[in-house]
Regions:
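Terminal alpha-helical segments
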Residues: 1-129
């Protein structure tokens, strides 16, 4: 694959995850919506990483802030803090008690606020690709 094809792959899968995020939110699966929102940002940052780095294989990390730094994402004022908060939505690495606490915290209003932030960040990252 060429560099451009790798970038397009990550963009496509990221956009697919945005749709899944919305569908999970509509279905009331707020925790999963945010988990998938995290994945969407991770993938779009990997597309940016490929654009701004010599290699075609982005780092194997789920840490959005680290990916953003290595992808040379031009952060706006509160982006770093928001990325660190969204890192917490990567539930696959969490213990069951943490998942349960997150599930309780994950109301419609809580999820809706972060979904707006995820979509804004996504758009900002796409604009830098």
């Amino acid at each position: 694959l060429k560099k451009k094809e790798y970038i397009q792959y990550w963009i496509r899968t990221s956009e697919s995850d945005l749709l899944s995020m919305d569908n999970n939110f509509i279905s009331g699966n707020y925790d999963w919506a945010l988990f998938i929102g995290h994945l969407s940002l991770e993938k779009i940052l990997k597309a940016l990483w490929i654009k701004n780095n010599p290699g075609d294989i982005p780092p194997k990390t789920h840490n959005l802030k680290k990916l953003a730094d290595e992808a040379k994402f031009q952060l706006r004022e509160n982006d770093a803090e928001t990325l660190l908060e969204i890192n917490d939505f990567n539930l696959e690495t969490r213990y069951p008690d943490y998942k349960f606490e997150f599930y309780k915290k994950c109301t419609k209003e809580f999820a809706e606020g972060y979904i707006i932030k995820i979509k804004e960040l996504h758009k900002c990252i796409v604009n830098q690709i």
